[in-house]
Amino acid sequence: MRFPTPLIPATLVRRYKRFLADVLLPDGTAATAHVANSGTMLGIDAPGSPVWLSRSPNPARKLPYTLELVEADGTLVGCNTAHPNRIVAEAVAAGEIPALAGYATLRREVKYGRNSRIDLLLEDPVRGSAYVEVKNVHLRRQGRLAEFPDCVTSRGAKHLEELAAMVAAGHRAVMVYLVQRADCDTFRIAADIDPAYAAGLRVALDHGVEALVLGCALTPDGIGIDRTLRLSA
């Protein structure tokens, strides 16, 4: 995924009310940016962190800047949760994810389950359907270990139940965890943060849902999938 325009470097002053961040632009001007992330952003919201912003071309937009990347522990981290679906969809379309290759069509945001939308629906007259849910991962608390979630996510647990229901109905279902940082090579569920989600994933896996963990290379020019991470128990 390429950013449509060059990102703007800035310095994070504070993140607050979940969807807002005060930043300092290169010329010292203060601005407020939109934060497209409903989680806590644990470990990547420290005041003084270098950040990168996109700027909307829409002059009517109240907040023209959006927080895209944060530098944490010496590495770039993608914090915009609107991007993972597109990143994975582009990689699938390009045949860059062997585990999700071989389907004739790809559709995004298709209604299914209990008033939900599946992130990606892959369909093929021979292979059948694959329901693919994508989660953004940015949490790292120790070593080269990425974790999800960074806060309790009842919505995420609901998605696991719906994926298991798709398997029961005869379809394939895949939970993709997209690690938007380059300093991790292993992944696990943060059971201490959300034990219910951890239990839900175990049940989903037992019922045939697949888990796929993909890592990204990030630059201010774009974000692309470059590796598969090991899922740790």
Swiss-Prot record:
This is Sugar fermentation stimulation protein homolog. The gene is sfsA. PANTHER family: SUGAR FERMENTATION STIMULATION PROTEIN A. It comes from the Bacteria. It comes from Rhodospirillum centenum (strain ATCC 51521 / SW). Pfam families: SfsA, SfsA_N. InterPro entries: SfsA, SfsA_C, SfsA_N. GO terms for molecular function: DNA binding. Belongs to the SfsA family.
